[in-house]
């Protein structure tokens, strides 16, 4: 219920401009809990080989990963691997903040060229890293960097000859990991997250050893990735990598075509200029002298409402009016709630930019379909009986029967007695 990234007044990371796509069915394509047996996050990364039809030893220069999240130790081992045929290089994903859009554009072009040259030199593990940021050099969005390199190497026919590993402080949430993998990353290293976990353990804010806390974080990300993959019926991470099963909201067609391998832009939006400006703003804030050592980061109210934080559609005023309206059956309070929802002070959703265009001359009511007939076209959303609970299921059935329309919920499980039960003459079945 927070503003879309493209209309937010605050600087946004690039991850926030994407939404997951999913199979729109009443039952999950795969149940990631009960059907976990058919799912796998095991990945083999490295050089596939130049000719898969004539296999040779070059096809075997790969590393098996049980999951795509690498710890700092695992990444260090990969960086210093000394076996014949295993070569690693680290490419910085930074741009000069003084140059703005041109600096970001040239940095991306140079990054792609460096990646191609590395492949030509026999490097089969390319690590894209933003560890070296400073007050003059901001991080290129990790998603933009990996997608740009991924699609560039595809265009020159060299993508399968190397693995792309992202070492970034941006990665925190499961969605971030899913996006990076979905746009071509072979593995990821969220070093900043591990640093935060280490700090929490050192300050005894987490009552467990660092190794256990680190393992728990990786386990949480793994379960989250399986849940995201299951929404599209994908059972292995190897099928998910590079699949780009996301929708961008607020990015321009030019940006998507050049760096993300698609021209589909629902509403258009920002390009490199705005991305450079937002990441420059975030970088300057990070290196601002106004911050003292040990100062807590501000809570901007992303996940829960805060007075001076990010705007929320479901703010305390809206929730209070809705609760009062339902508890008291007050139509006045309902109208107040509807006013808050329909006429926000600042836009949050795309629909907030739209309004009804009133006709110059009202159409007589006797020339249009009556209200009683219109409501019969409505149906409820499809949810299972178990997900709704008996109380909600009966309330929906009663309401739909009163209106003369249809309830699309149930999926079995109703008590047979309901077929013979009614409330005020209205059936509960």
Model-derived segments and spans:
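Glycine-rich, proline-tolerant flexible connector loops at the mouths of alpha/beta enzymes
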Residues: 128-144, 416
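Conserved, mostly hydrophobic/aromatic
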Residues: 130, 149, 180, 236, ...
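Glycine- and other small-residue-rich loops at beta-strand/loop junctions that grip anionic moieties
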Residues: 7, 131, 138, 166-169, ...
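Glycine-rich beta-to-alpha transition loops that act as phosphate-gripper elements at the mouths
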Residues: 162-174, 411
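Short, ordered loop/turn segments at secondary-structure junctions
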Residues: 131-133, 169, 185, 192-197, ...
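Flexible, glycine-rich loop/tail regions that form catalytic "lids" or insertion modules at the edges
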Residues: 1-105, 114-118, 122-125, 176-177, ...
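Catalytic cores of alpha/beta
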Residues: 170-184
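Alpha-helix-loop-beta-strand connector modules within alpha/beta enzyme cores
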Residues: 138-166, 216-223, 227
């Amino acid at each position: 219920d927070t503003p879309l990234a493209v209309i937010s007044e605050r600087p946004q990371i690039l991850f926030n401009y994407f939404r997951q796509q999913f199979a729109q069915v009443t039952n999950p394509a795969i149940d990631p809990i009960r059907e976990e047996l058919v799912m796998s996050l095991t990945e083999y990364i490295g050089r596939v080989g130049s000719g898969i039809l004539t296999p040779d030893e070059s096809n075997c220069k790969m590393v098996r990963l049980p999951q795509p999240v690498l710890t700092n130790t695992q990444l260090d081992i990969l960086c210093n691997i000394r076996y014949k045929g295993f070569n690693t290089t680290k490419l910085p994903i930074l741009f000069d903040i003084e140059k703005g859009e041109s600096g970001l554009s040239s940095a991306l072009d140079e990054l792609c060229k460096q990646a191609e040259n590395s492949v030509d030199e026999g490097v089969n593990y390319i690590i894209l890293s933003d560890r070296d940021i400073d007050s003059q050099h901001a991080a290129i969005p990790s998603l933009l960097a990996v997608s740009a390199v991924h699609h560039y190497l595809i265009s020159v026919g060299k993508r399968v000859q190397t693995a792309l590993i992202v070492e970034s402080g941006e990665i925190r949430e499961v969605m971030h990991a899913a996006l990076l993998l979905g746009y071509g990353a072979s593995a990821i290293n969220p070093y900043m997250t591990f640093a935060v976990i280490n700090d929490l353990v050192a300050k005894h804010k987490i009552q467990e050893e660092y190794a256990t806390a680190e393992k728990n974080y990786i386990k949480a990300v793994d379960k989250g990735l399986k849940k995201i993959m299951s929404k599209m019926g994908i059972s292995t991470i190897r099928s998910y990598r590079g699949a780009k099963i996301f929708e961008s909201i607020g990015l321009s067609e030019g940006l998507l075509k050049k760096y993300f391998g698609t021209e589909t832009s629902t509403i258009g939006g920002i390009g490199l200029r705005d991305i450079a400006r937002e990441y420059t703003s975030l970088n300057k804030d990070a290196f601002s002298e106004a911050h003292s050592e040990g100062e807590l980061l501000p809570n901007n109210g992303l996940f829960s409402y805060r007075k001076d934080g990010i705007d929320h559609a479901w703010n305390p005023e809206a929730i209070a009016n809705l609760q009062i309206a339902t508890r008291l059956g007050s139509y006045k309070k309902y109208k107040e709630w509807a006013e808050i929802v329909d006429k926000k002070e600042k836009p949050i959703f795309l629909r907030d930019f739209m309004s009804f265009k009133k006709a110059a001359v009202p159409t007589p009511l006797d020339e249009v379909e009556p209200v009683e007939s219109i409501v019969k076209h409505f149906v409820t959303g499809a949810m299972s009986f178990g997900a709704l609970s008996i109380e909600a299921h009966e309330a929906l059935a009663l309401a739909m029967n009163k209106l003369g329309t249809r309830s699309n919920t149930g999926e079995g499980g109703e008590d047979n007695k309901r077929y013979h039960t009614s409330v005020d003459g209205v059936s509960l079945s």
